[in-house]
Amino acid sequence: MTAITDIIAREILDSRGNPTVEVDVYLEDGSMGRAAVPSGASTGAHEAVELRDGGKRYLGKGVEKAVEAVNSEIYDAIGGHDAENQIQIDTIMRELDGTPNKSRLGANAILGVSLAVAKAAAEASGLPLYRYVGGPNARILPVPMMNIINGGAHADNPIDFQEFMIMPVGADNIRDAVRMGSEVFHTLKKELSAQGFNTNVGDEGGFAPGLKSAPEALDFIMKSIEKAGYRPGEDMYLALDCASTEFFKDGKYVLEGEGRTLEPEAMAEYLAELAAKYPIISIEDGMGEDDWDGWKYLTDKIGATTQLVGDDLFVTNSARLRDGIRMGVANSILVKVNQIGSLSETLDAVETAHKAAYTAVMSHRSGETEDSIIADLSVATNCGQIKTGSLSRSDRLAKYNQLIRIEELLGPQAAYAGTSILKA
């Protein structure tokens, strides 16, 4: 009854107005799963590869080739297979593609099918997706990393670091966490406006003011947390995504907004200073994706007290993660389904992290859709943290709203991760 009977892919638009792939998977019993694929702006060199059309249409970003791959070659390979055999289906698609980075058929094609298959199987089983994927023990609601000031590749301003986030660790539940984040977000808007900064938002819904340095952004956030009635370092903590690969040039970190260039050790020292001065509990991509020595130095320096998240470093790839674990580099992995290109490989990366006592943070991309699957996956994996943007833009809020629904469905079983994520 859960055999795949039809697959239909189409080209839709993401939150940046760029084309992306949406896939519908139909099963023998009439169940249907629909998934839309996200896309990143700051992408790691080691990520699985999206298939784009090139040419003039959509300025080269069309995905008709990926859509055609789904509707023909992929359907021919997995049509008739049981949707409940997720690993088998993902393996068939990976082998059909035949490249190490899914570049022939496109990670966007393979991922769209992979996620839609899981959604269809969940519907056929009569279970919500988080329960279907995670089983009976899936019940942890994640602490959100809320990106309220954007810089770097996500905004047109001088700030070098890409994301400045708040984490409402002191909330009692996900509803309170969202409320607390919203209150700080709107307080920050007033603070920025009062000092003459624009309050336009970036790709992920955070503000993109013309600030020049990380401390300047952090000071605004600290003040806004306090003005909203919360205590930095108790109710709310801070997190950074430096996206350092974006400004790692010729072996050095070029902070153009701050007007200085740092050697890897000096960059690590700078991050350590920020973590000591502010209640920062998580730093993502503090060093460049191939600066393994810099990562090791940073980990040795502050890894015992600070979550050090590898995004471009690990690209949701279990093999790269195992390299990092062996070298004692970082202590957490950012999990983005489209970096690796299938659901089963995504879940394997989370499992690999947890077995090594690394944390995992479920994450969106800067180019998102209304699809809220990462909310379900964050609960399914009990990873305890989610990164899905700010408290504006419906493509971001879709995930927060889904978490609120999941918490309601779980009832008394629901547990908010809260202070359990703190390292020290």
Swiss-Prot record:
What keywords is this UniProt entry annotated with?
Answer: Cytoplasm, Glycolysis, Lyase, Magnesium, Metal-binding, Secreted
Listed cofactors = Mg(2+)
Q: Where does Mg(2+) bind?
A: 241, 284, 311
Q: Which SMART domains match?
A: Enolase_C (SM01192), Enolase_N (SM01193)
Q: Transmembrane segments in this chain: where? A: none
Q: How is the cofactor bound?
A: Binds a second Mg(2+) ion via substrate during catalysis.
| One example GO MF annotation | phosphopyruvate hydratase activity
- State whether keyword Metal-binding applies: yes
Q: Which GO terms describe its biological process?
A: glycolytic process
Q: Which GO terms describe its cellular component?
A: cell surface; extracellular region; phosphopyruvate hydratase complex
Residues of the active site: 204, 336
The reaction(s) annotated as catalysed by this protein in its Swiss-Prot or TrEMBL entry are:
(2R)-2-phosphoglycerate = phosphoenolpyruvate + H2O
List the pathway annotation: Carbohydrate degradation; glycolysis; pyruvate from D-glyceraldehyde 3-phosphate: step 4/5
Per the record, the similarity remark reads: Belongs to the enolase family.
The record's function comment reads: Catalyzes the reversible conversion of 2-phosphoglycerate (2-PG) into phosphoenolpyruvate (PEP). It is essential for the degradation of carbohydrates via glycolysis.
Output the PANTHER family linked to this UniProt entry.
Answer: ENOLASE
Q: Protein name, please?
A: Enolase
Q: Which gene encodes it?
A: eno
